[in-house]
Amino acid sequence: MPRSSNDQVPRHYALDGTWPHAALADDAPVSAHYGQALARNLERAMSSTGHTLRTLADATGVTHSTISRVANGRVMPDLGTIARLEAAFGFQLWPGPAALPPASPLPSASASV
């Protein structure tokens, strides 16, 4: 799956601990935080539903190796993969802004004019 910009896979930014619960580097990009939160959500979803990599692959059409790579932070999944996983579980896995570390909001566009 192609990556945008020069971001590394999410796991690249893990400092210590066990993925996906490891602390991320201070300079980890947004994609790493989202990837980590997605992996946590996927882990919880699989645990709560009893799915294995293979049963989830059968239910979604996503290969078990791709699901494993998403769960292990070794790939940035594409939208189609996320959509198929969410459809199989019946709930949202994509974390949204809640995955981001606390930061100052961006100034409004009118503030810089």
Residue positions per predicted region:
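DNA major-groove recognition helix of helix-turn-helix/homeodomain DNA-binding modules
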Residues: G80-P95
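Short alpha-helical "recognition helix" segments of helix-turn-helix
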Residues: T52-A59, I67
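N-terminal flexible/basic segments that precede or flank functional cores
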Residues: M1-R44, S104-V113
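Core residues of bacterial helix-turn-helix
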Residues: T49, T60, A88-F89
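Recognition helix of helix-turn-helix/homeodomain-like DNA-binding domains
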Residues: G61-M76
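Helix-turn-helix DNA-binding elements, focusing on the entry/boundary residues of the two helices
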Residues: L53, H64, L79-I82
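The alpha-helix within a helix-turn-helix
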Residues: M46, A57, E86
